[in-house]
């Protein structure tokens, strides 16, 4: 079995720093612990993304055991995996009906929205807005779609959320047993997701031609590390 040792080492390091942010750093500074926890939460989400594509073992099933519990508490790993892989299988990127990761709406649906909702979505379509309110907007929209699937009898989605509740409860139990206050961890989760919104905001802008919806993100430094240097997104 092929093992990508640098990636595996990064996974171990991510959990080690996350643990330090919970059990050690709050004794020095809660603000510092929140900042470090937020960075590790963002990094963990990037690692989950890598696992969906078969890293670090060359087979997704083994890698999933390392990242099944979502540290940001927002999205079940199973649902992230399924929708993300469906997104990559779709040639019509940004299509609001075909692309499960699209941030766009059908014009006919848009004109039927209340004015206040249009304002919120327009704000969400700026980088500052995506970082500030994007975690809430995307969570509400995603959970509404998921609830619809569950009501329609999708047992796979229901199982994914049931497992997510159990695993998230486990994460929160670890947080509750740590030095970091639970409220501080929830803030760290929000910041971590907000950081991820920087990348997803840049990916797949609407364009008349499909090839115009693929991006190359030129970046260096901390953000490049948190996004694991995945500069090409197709």
PLM regions and their residue ranges:
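Non-catalytic, topology-defining segments of multipass membrane proteins
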Residues: 1-43, 47, 70-186
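Short hydrophobic "helix-edge" motifs at membrane interfaces and signal-peptide entry regions
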Residues: 38-40, 65, 104-105, 193-195, ...
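Acidic (Asp/Glu-rich) catalytic motifs at the cytosolic membrane interface
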Residues: 41-60, 80-93, 199, 203-206, ...
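Short hydrophobic/aromatic-rich motifs at helix boundaries and adjacent loops
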Residues: 52-57, 142-143, 168-170, 222-226
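Juxtamembrane helix-capping/reentrant segments at transmembrane boundaries
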Residues: 55-75, 97-113, 210-224
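Hydrophobic alpha-helical membrane-insertion segments
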Residues: 58-59, 123, 173, 177, ...
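Extended hydrophobic/aromatic segments used for targeting, binding, or gating
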Residues: 185-227
């Amino acid at each position: 079995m092929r093992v990508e040792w640098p990636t595996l080492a990064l996974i171990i390091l991510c959990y080690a720093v996350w643990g330090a942010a919970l059990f050690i750093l709050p004794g020095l500074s809660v603000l510092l612990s929140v900042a470090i926890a937020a960075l590790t939460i963002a990094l963990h989400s990037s690692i989950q993304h890598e696992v969906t594509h078969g890293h670090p073992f060359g087979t997704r099933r083994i890698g999933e055991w390392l990242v099944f519990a979502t540290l940001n508490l927002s999205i079940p790993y199973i649902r992230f995996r399924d929708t993300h892989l469906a997104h990559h299988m779709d040639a019509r990127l940004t299509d609001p009906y075909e692309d499960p990761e699209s941030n766009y709406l059908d014009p006919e649906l848009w004109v039927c929205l209340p004015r206040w909702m249009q304002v919120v979505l327009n704000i969400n379509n700026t980088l500052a807005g995506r970082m500030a309110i994007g975690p809430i907007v995307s969570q509400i929209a995603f959970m509404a779609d998921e609830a619809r699937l569950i009501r329609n009898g999708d047992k796979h989605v229901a199982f994914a959320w049931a497992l997510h509740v159990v695993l998230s409860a486990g994460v929160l139990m670890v947080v509750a047993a740590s030095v970091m206050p639970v409220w501080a961890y929830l803030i760290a989760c929000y910041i971590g997701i907000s950081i991820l919104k920087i990348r997803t905001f840049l990916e797949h802008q609407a364009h008349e031609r499909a090839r115009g919806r693929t991006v190359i993100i030129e970046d260096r430094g901390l953000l490049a590390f948190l996004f694991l240097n995945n500069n090409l997104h197709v």
